[in-house]
């Protein structure tokens, strides 16, 4: 053990007294975890990352979900209102000749 620490700038050699070379070897014998895909994806597939911020994208999605029901309800009310009420725009009854004196 002293040969291993010989050239190191250490003041107290007892700092390394608990070091055991056997423990280092045991840790390196474990196999690393490997990702195994469960689906086959085409090799031509191109992965593109979105440039928008993740938080902003999430907030927009939540806002769309929240307001989708309101928007649908409003459209239904408008459709029902159009069938029973007269149209909002009314055809002009005055002729264009009346405004020529200006």
Swiss-Prot record:
Transmembrane segments: none
Basic and acidic residues bias locations: 66-75, 91-102
Record keyword Acetylation present: yes
Keywords: Acetylation, Phosphoprotein, Ubl conjugation pathway
InterPro entries in the record: DDA1-like, DDA1_dom
Subunit structure: Component of numerous DCX (DDB1-CUL4-X-box) E3 ubiquitin-protein ligase complexes which consist of a core of DDB1, cullin-4 (CUL4A or CUL4B), DDA1 and RBX1. Component of the DCX(DCAF15) complex, also named CLR4(DCAF15) complex, composed of DCAF15, DDB1, cullin-4 (CUL4A or CUL4B), DDA1 and RBX1. Part of the DDD core complex containing DET1, DDA1 and DDB1; the DDD core complex recruits a specific UBE2E enzyme, such as UBE2E1, UBE2E2 UBE2E3, to form specific DDD-E2 complexes.
Keyword Acetylation on entry: yes
Pathway the protein contributes to: Protein modification; protein ubiquitination
Official protein name in the record: DET1- and DDB1-associated protein 1
Native source organism of the sequence: Homo sapiens (Human)
GO cellular component labels: Cul4-RING E3 ubiquitin ligase complex; nucleoplasm
Functional summary from the UniProt entry: Functions as a component of numerous distinct DCX (DDB1-CUL4-X-box) E3 ubiquitin-protein ligase complexes which mediate the ubiquitination and subsequent proteasomal degradation of target proteins. In the DCX complexes, acts as a scaffolding subunit required to stabilize the complex.
GO BP annotations listed: positive regulation of proteasomal ubiquitin-dependent protein catabolic process; protein polyubiquitination
Spans annotated as Disordered: 66-102
Phosphoserine PTM positions: 33, 95
The family this protein is said to belong to: Belongs to the DDA1 family.
Pfam families linked to this entry: DDA1
UniProt modified residues of type N-acetylalanine: 2
């Amino acid at each position: 053990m002293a040969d291993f620490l010989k050239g190191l700038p250490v003041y107290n050699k007892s700092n390394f007294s608990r070091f055991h070379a056997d423990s280092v070897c045991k840790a390196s014998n474990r196999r690393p975890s490997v990702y195994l895909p469960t689906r086959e994806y085409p090799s031509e597939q191109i992965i593109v990352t979105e440039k928008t911020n993740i938080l902003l994208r999430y907030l927009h999605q939540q806002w769309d979900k929240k307001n989708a029901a309101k928007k649908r309800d409003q459209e239904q009310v408008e459709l029902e209102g159009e069938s029973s009420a007269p149209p909002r725009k009314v055809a002009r009854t005055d002729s264009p000749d009346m405004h020529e004196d200006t």
